[in-house]
């Protein structure tokens, strides 16, 4: 018998089946490779890595793929926006988000030989994977294009 029970194994295989209007969001709070400047990091992420992976994401039905680059230039903007209740500034270099209908779509993409041969190995060129963290959760949108999104 395996050291993991069926319950433990299936808990890592969650999907959103049965919830057709629910999207899942994988968020990576990313740090750049220490040897790169902010400019080099952003260039590699947006001009090299995104170009490698975006066509695969489209092919596998990924709904959205975004990056928010936090730089020396943008970080001071927070002081215009924050209040005492939310005053802790994050030190991530980038926040990357992937929105998909089912985690199986993302897993199929990651298993594609093109991903394994070109995309996955590229991470060592720009990412500090020891410091970067990830989380996954349900994606909810309340305002889009300046309009309230109708909810039940």
Swiss-Prot record:
Induction per the UniProt record: Expression is regulated by the aurofusarin biosynthesis cluster-specific transcription factor aurR1/GIP2.
Protein name (record): Dehydratase aurZ
Pfam families assigned to the protein according to its UniProt record, in alphabetical order: EthD
Phenotype of null mutants: Impairs autofusarin biosynthesis and leads to the accumulation of the intermediate YWA1.
EC annotation from Swiss-Prot or TrEMBL: 1.-.-.-
EthD domain segment(s): 34-129
Keyword Oxidoreductase among UniProt keywords: yes
Keyword set, alphabetical order: Monooxygenase, Oxidoreductase
InterPro entries per the UniProt record, alphabetical: Dimeric_a/b-barrel (IPR011008), EthD_dom (IPR009799)
One GO molecular-function entry: monooxygenase activity
Assigned protein family: Belongs to the tpcK family.
Function: Dehydratase; part of the gene cluster that mediates the biosynthesis of aurofusarin, a red mycelium pigment which is acting as a mycotoxin. The first step is performed by the polyketide synthase which condenses one acetyl-CoA and 6 malonyl-CoA units to form the first intermediate, the cyclic heptaketide and yellow pigment YWA1. The C2 hydroxyl group in the pyrone ring of YWA1 is probably formed during ring closure by an aldol-type cyclization reaction. The dehydratase aurZ then acts as the first tailoring enzyme in the aurofusarin biosynthetic pathway by converting YWA1 to nor-rubrofusarin.
Pathway: Pigment biosynthesis
Key word Oxidoreductase present: yes
Species of the source: Gibberella zeae (strain ATCC MYA-4620 / CBS 123657 / FGSC 9075 / NRRL 31084 / PH-1)
Reactions performed catalytically: naphtopyrone YWA1 = norrubrofusarin + H2O + H(+)
């Amino acid at each position: 018998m395996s050291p993991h029970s069926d319950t433990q194994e299936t808990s890592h295989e969650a999907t959103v089946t049965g919830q057709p209007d629910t999207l899942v969001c994988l968020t990576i709070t990313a740090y750049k490779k220490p040897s790169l400047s902010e400019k080099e990091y952003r260039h590699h992420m947006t001009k090299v890595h995104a170009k490698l992976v975006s066509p695969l994401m489209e092919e596998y039905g990924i709904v959205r793929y975004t990056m928010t680059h936090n730089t020396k230039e943008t970080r001071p903007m927070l002081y215009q926006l924050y209040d005492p209740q939310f005053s802790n500034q994050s030190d991530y270099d980038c926040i990357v988000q992937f929105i998909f209908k089912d985690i199986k779509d993302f897993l199929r993409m990651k298993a594609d030989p093109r991903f394994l041969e070109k995309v996955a190995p590229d991470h060592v060129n720009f990412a500090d994977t020891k410091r970067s963290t990830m989380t996954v959760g349900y994606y909810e949108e309340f305002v889009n294009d300046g309009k309230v999104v109708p909810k039940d």
